[in-house]
């Protein structure tokens, strides 16, 4: 299995256009040892030729241009993207579908709840239906697994996660299974297994059992501490209120990952305020001591 990190930041990217926190200001000034990052999205493939896009970031055009494998140029109009899988209906995971409209029709895989949001509160399916057939919905059931024709050797198991629908959703305050999912992806040729969950707010015993099956964990790295947005004076909500498990402290992501046998443990969807973006920070050093990596745009993983 080939995995390309197209974008590794949380919503807004890094630096965020209107943010002057220490990280964003430091990166702009050239005083911070850090890499700029676009909003999170990955591409996966079983052969390195045909690819599945997992989430469609607002930064998708720049991300596609940065990865030549996604433009094989076999015809006057071409793409190596054979399908798109949406893990949720968040704006920063779906807005890129608008940028991809010239390539319609697209095969889009998502749950019933995500499809509801994207035909009501943020009606992308409706908006794009006049673009050469628009978005073709392939339902993701919350039980069993599925494969996608362009990458038939990748068997994908959806994992329902405990989190909320986006703020715009008609059922924002009425959570349903399928609002957010993680993916357990197994390459039947190599046996390599990836667990991908860029938005992870709570970890149940059942989820821990699933995570233990993976060779590589690519999981939520949004915030170092739950009150990070408040401490940095750039927000009013706790990470837990936004559906993100902090890295530090009892029950945090570091503690969760310490109990995992995976060969690689990688954080993705990193908020611009997170001190782990500073490669010289104490927090980054702590991650290294625990064998935890930090995803960056352009990172390649092979399983």
From Swiss-Prot:
Gene3D superfamilies named in the record: Ribonuclease Z/Hydroxyacylglutathione hydrolase-like
Family: Belongs to the PqqB family.
Entries under Pfam families matching the protein: Lactamase_B_2 (PF12706)
Protein's pathway: Cofactor biosynthesis; pyrroloquinoline quinone biosynthesis
Record GO biological process: pyrroloquinoline quinone biosynthetic process
PANTHER family hit by this protein: COENZYME PQQ SYNTHESIS PROTEIN B, HYDROLASE C777.06C-RELATED-RELATED
UniProt name for this protein: Coenzyme PQQ synthesis protein B
Keywords: PQQ biosynthesis, Transport
Domain of life: Bacteria
Protein purpose: May be involved in the transport of PQQ or its precursor to the periplasm.
């Amino acid at each position: 299995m080939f995995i390309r990190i197209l974008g590794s930041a949380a919503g807004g990217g890094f630096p965020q256009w209107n943010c002057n926190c220490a990280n964003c200001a430091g990166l702009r000034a050239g005083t911070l040892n850090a890499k700029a990052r676009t909003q999170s999205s990955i591409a996966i493939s079983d052969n390195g030729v045909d690819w599945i896009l997992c989430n469609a970031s607002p930064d998708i055009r720049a991300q596609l241009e940065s990865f030549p494998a996604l433009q094989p140029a076999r015809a006057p109009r071409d793409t190596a993207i054979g399908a798109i899988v949406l893990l949720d209906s968040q704006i920063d995971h779906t807005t890129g579908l608008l940028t991809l409209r010239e390539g319609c029709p697209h095969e889009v895989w998502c749950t019933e709840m995500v499809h509801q949001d994207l035909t009501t509160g943020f009606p992308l399916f409706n908006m794009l239906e006049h673009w050469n057939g628009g978005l073709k919905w392939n339902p993701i059931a919350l039980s069993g697994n599925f494969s996608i024709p362009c990458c038939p050797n990748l068997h994908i198991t959806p994992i329902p996660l405990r989190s909320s629908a986006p703020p715009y959703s008609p059922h924002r305050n009425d959570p349903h299974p399928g609002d957010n999912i993680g993916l357990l992806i197994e390459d039947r040729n190599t046996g390599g297994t990836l667990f991908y969950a860029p938005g992870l707010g709570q970890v149940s015993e059942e989820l821990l059992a699933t995570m233990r099956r993976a060779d590589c964990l690519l999981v939520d790295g949004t915030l170092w501490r739950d009150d990070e947005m408040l401490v940095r004076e750039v927000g009013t909500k706790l990470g837990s209120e936004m559906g993100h498990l902090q890295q530090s402290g009892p029950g945090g992501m570091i503690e969760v990952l310490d109990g995992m046998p995976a060969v690689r443990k990688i954080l993705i969807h990193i908020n611009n305020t997170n001190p782990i973006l500073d490669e010289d920070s104490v927090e980054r050093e702590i991650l290294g001591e625990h064998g935890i990596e930090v995803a960056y745009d352009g990172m390649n993983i092979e399983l």
